[in-house]
């Protein structure tokens, strides 16, 4: 019986360590800013991209990665999504209060 408990504990610890790594990498991706590419596809021959900021970065895209594409940083997308969820939730709550709390 103890061997089964020890085996279950080892499996649980292994899975928890893997989940911990996944959570850390997800948090790290959201909280870091990307520098982006400065030339697409390579310096001297490629197109010069703009400079990146804390709000956006440039990424090579298009046919043969010859064009510079504008991308928002991950934290900007998370913030916009959070504001969207808060806005929709407050709208729904206000609508429910208006319908249910009439005098």
UniProtKB/Swiss-Prot annotation:
Cystine pairs annotated here are none
Q: Would you indicate the residue range of the signal peptide?
A: 1-16
Query: Record's superkingdom?
Result: Eukaryota
- Extracellular side: which ranges? 17-75
Q: What is one cellular component GO term in this UniProt entry?
A: perikaryon
Q: Which residues lie on this side of the membrane: Cytoplasmic?
A: 97-103
- Family matches, as Pfam families: DUF2650
Q: Does the keyword Transmembrane helix apply?
A: yes
Query: What is the protein's species of origin?
Result: Caenorhabditis elegans
Q: How would you describe this protein's topology in the membrane?
A: Single-pass type I membrane protein
What does the tissue specificity note say?
A: Expressed in a subset of neurons and in body wall muscles. In the nervous system, expressed specifically in cholinergic motor neurons of the ventral nerve cord, a subset of cholinergic head neurons, anterior sublateral neurons, and body sublateral neurons (at protein level).
Which residue windows are transmembrane per the record?
A: 76-96
Q: Is the keyword Nucleotide-binding assigned to this protein?
A: no
Compartment(s) of residence = Cell membrane; Perikaryon; Cell projection; Synapse
Please summarize what the entry says happens upon disruption of the gene. Answer: Mild decrease in swimming behavior but otherwise no apparent phenotype.
Q: What is this protein called?
A: Protein SUP-1
Q: Which UniProt keywords apply?
A: Cell membrane, Cell projection, Cytoplasmic vesicle, Membrane, Signal, Synapse, Transmembrane, Transmembrane helix
State its role.
May be involved in trafficking or stabilization of the vesicular acetylcholine transporter unc-17.
Show the InterPro entries listed in the entry: SUP-1-like
